[in-house]
């Protein structure tokens, strides 16, 4: 064991010993009992499975806003209940390797997917030389693990894309979107668009939005003239589009779930923030524009776990699975300064966290990590404040008013990411590695070591 790893494990042991003692006291007062989780968290052995949960744009302000509104200031979300919590830095780099202090989702995702920092907009390629870098999903496949990706964005959006594609620019989502990726086209000898690469990689489970990208026609190569969806079917994929189809999907063949033309519709709605603020409002927790046949993120995550586990059992494999689950529209609603949409997506993501933790409770050889790719714009401010930008006043489940402000860009423009560090929390084998302040690229190492990927 390397000296730095041994030292971190010793520190983790001391922290957990103290935490376990504290839990023993607080449990009697009704607090959740995480003593056994705490003991398991310092395990340095191999994990059979890894479930990585990404709340896109879910900084501490976004978590606090969702907590305050849904469970109260003194309540706890599922993501608050992990035994080990740290923080990691999120910066990207310029082509020369110097820091770019505010990342986008492509560069941040590349960081944990490959262990390499890159420039904003690039998907799993180096910053200066634009060379493809092996991803954690590709390594997991090579080592015999089942793999999956579940998201509420288009499957070709940046965060899911970093796992199984390599393109110069994140906009190159389908065969018709390759203007910024001339060297990545199949005609130029490249691997093609993000959609084409995703199915060519034979990822076992792909569930999200983005049907419009997969409906585009392949322009070159073996599948020329087909849509990417038809290409996927040629490669053996079961293609499903709603809850019923997802429920009936079998584990014998890979699954491509295309649940929406674009991003999956959000769960909640309400008035967007406005210059000068809004009247106090309660969020509408059932979006009338979300089809009733659309599975929740938690339902999609549950099915993905079932499919991946069943595949490995049928193959009598000693290896388990790697699964990434993304709550993508926390970020998208932050960009739109829509607090109700944002809170609803955070709450939906938190239910997926509950699914992952419930699975890990029955399978303690599962490493579960939850984190964000970057911080975002929303801030809880005093009710009497008159901040610049866009504001909204909400009435929480506790019956209190809460003012949220968005001021990282001019009103009318998309609100911007922030360069802050973000939370990372974990349980299971190798979870101690998240303690302290780490780098986003360290998450790649944590997963690689947990699964013993070589």
Model region roles, listed by residue range:
Residues 144-146, 363:
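Secondary-structure transition into beta-strands, especially the periplasmic turns and strand N-termini
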Residues 48-62, 67, 128-144, 154:
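Active-site-adjacent structural elements in enzyme catalytic domains
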Residues 115, 139, 143, 209, ...:
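Mid-sequence acidic-hydrophobic segments that form the walls
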Residues 1-31:
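Secretory targeting and sorting signals
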């Amino acid at each position: 064991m390397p000296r730095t790893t041994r030292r971190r494990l010793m520190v983790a042991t001391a922290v957990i010993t103290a935490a376990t003692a504290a839990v023993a006291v607080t449990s009697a007062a009704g607090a959740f009992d995480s003593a056994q989780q705490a003991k398991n968290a310092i395990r340095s052995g191999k994990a059979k499975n890894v479930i990585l949960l990404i709340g896109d744009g879910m900084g501490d302000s976004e978590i606090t806003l969702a907590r305050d509104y849904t469970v109260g200031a003194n309540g706890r979300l599922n993501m608050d209940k992990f035994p080990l919590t740290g923080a990691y830095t999120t910066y990207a780099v310029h082509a020369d390797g110097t820091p770019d202090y505010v990342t986008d989702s492509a560069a941040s995702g590349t960081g944990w997917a490959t262990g390499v920092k890159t420039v904003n907009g690039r998907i799993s390629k180096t910053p200066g030389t634009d060379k493809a870098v092996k991803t954690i999903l590709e390594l997991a496949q090579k080592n015999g693990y089942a793999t999956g990706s579940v998201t509420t964005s288009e499957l070709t959006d940046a965060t899911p894309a970093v796992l199984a594609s390599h393109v110069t620019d994140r906009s190159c989502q389908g065969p018709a979107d390759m203007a910024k990726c001339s060297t990545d086209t199949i005609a130029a000898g490249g691997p093609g668009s993000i959609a084409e690469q995703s199915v060519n990689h034979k990822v076992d489970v792909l569930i999200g939005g983005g049907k419009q990208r997969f409906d585009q026609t392949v322009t070159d190569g073996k599948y020329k003239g087909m849509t990417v969806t038809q290409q996927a079917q040629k490669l053996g994929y079961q293609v499903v589009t709603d809850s019923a189809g997802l429920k009936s999907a079998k584990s014998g063949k890979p699954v491509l779930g295309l649940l929406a033309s674009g991003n999956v519709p959000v769960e909640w709605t309400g008035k967007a923030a406005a210059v000068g603020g809004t009247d106090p409002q309660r969020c509408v927790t059932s979006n009338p524009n979300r089809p009733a046949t659309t599975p929740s993120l938690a339902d999609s995550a549950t099915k993905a776990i079932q499919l991946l586990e069943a595949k490995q059992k049928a193959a009598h494999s000693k290896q388990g699975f790697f699964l990434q689950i993304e709550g993508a529209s926390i970020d998208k609603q932050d960009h739109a300064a829509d607090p109700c949409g944002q809170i609803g997506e955070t709450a939906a993501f938190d239910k997926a966290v509950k699914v992952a933790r419930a699975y890990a409770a029955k399978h303690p050889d599962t490493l579960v990590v939850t984190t964000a790719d970057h911080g975002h714009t929303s801030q809880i401010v005093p009710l009497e404040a008159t901040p610049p930008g866009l504001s909204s006043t909400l009435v929480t489940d506790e019956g209190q008013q809460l003012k949220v402000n968005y001021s990282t860009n001019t009103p009318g423009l998309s609100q911007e990411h922030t360069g802050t560090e973000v939370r990372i929390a974990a349980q299971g084998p190798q979870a101690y590695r998240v303690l302290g302040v780490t780098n986003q690229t360290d998450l790649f190492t944590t997963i690689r070591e947990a699964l013993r990927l070589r």
